[in-house]
Amino acid sequence: GIWQDMTSAIAQNRDIAVDGVLRFANDFDQLLENAGGDGALATLDSQLVDGLLTKNAFREKVGEIVGWQDTALNGIGFQSYLAVHSDPSAGSDAQDQLIGVLTVQGGIVESGAGGVDVANAEMLVDQIRMAKDDDQIKALVMRVDSPGGSAFASELIREELAALQAVGKPVVASFGPVAASGGYWISADADAIYAEPTTITGSIGIFGLVPNVSRSLDAIGINADGVSSAPLARGLSVVGELSEQAKKILQLSIEHGYDEFIDLVATGRNMPKASVEAIAQGRVWSGTAALEIGLVDELGDLEDAIARAAELA
């Protein structure tokens, strides 16, 4: 599972036993007592860090490695670094053979402002269309870090990706920390899917939620009433109880959406529907487990996905 992958990675990177990592996690109180209450010393004793330095001493240590420019560390700013490395084809003869990278980060919504916590489907669709119309871009890598969101918005993105594939441009999905529910919906048809071992993915399912404050209003003596031309004319009111008819409509709609999700995954992953149903029902999987059950093709990072896209292009 994710915990085993994480502790193994820490142990390997620090060249220590996994038991030492587990002891730090499970018995930190004892380690802290042994270190006289000094958390930094307890971390050093557990070999999770190489040394303890003040900020100034650390700066001097870095200076010994990278050198100095007068009184400043010898280095470049982050923006300057990006300016040099932003174009992977810079300095090569492959200017007309580019791999596009599309980032889908945050909850998936139909429209509205984008940002760290929001993946705007309208903006993403426009970007995918630009990649489709750009003759220099031969394939697209979609980096997904999303817990999902609107099923409708997810389908808009998936349809545009399908249009990109239809003109002969492969799509490779690269999963970050989370690629679940709608995040998997948009990825299921990809030509290849890469995940990190600790990625949380799957969550093949749909749910609906209708907020209701009628009991809260009752508690303070406020009642809602009204007349309508038909039983469903009032829509889904937050101040009244859902009718049995409305509940039935919601349930049927959700079940239909779930069936579509199952069909989509079965088609995209070339799996029988029964096999998808067995691993669906909203359950989440680590990247390692997802590889075993066929939800992803390879374990790897963004660079691995880009390399695969280049092979497919």
Task: Describe the predicted segments one by one.
Residues 54-56, 302-303:
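Beta->alpha turn/N-cap motifs
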Residues 1-37, 49-51, 59, 63-172, ...:
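Small-residue-centered hinge/linker elements
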Residues 19-46, 51, 270-300:
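Amphipathic alpha-helical substructures
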Residues 304-313:
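C-terminal intrinsically disordered, low-complexity extensions immediately downstream
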Residues 147, 282-284, 305-306:
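Active/binding-pocket-proximal capping segment
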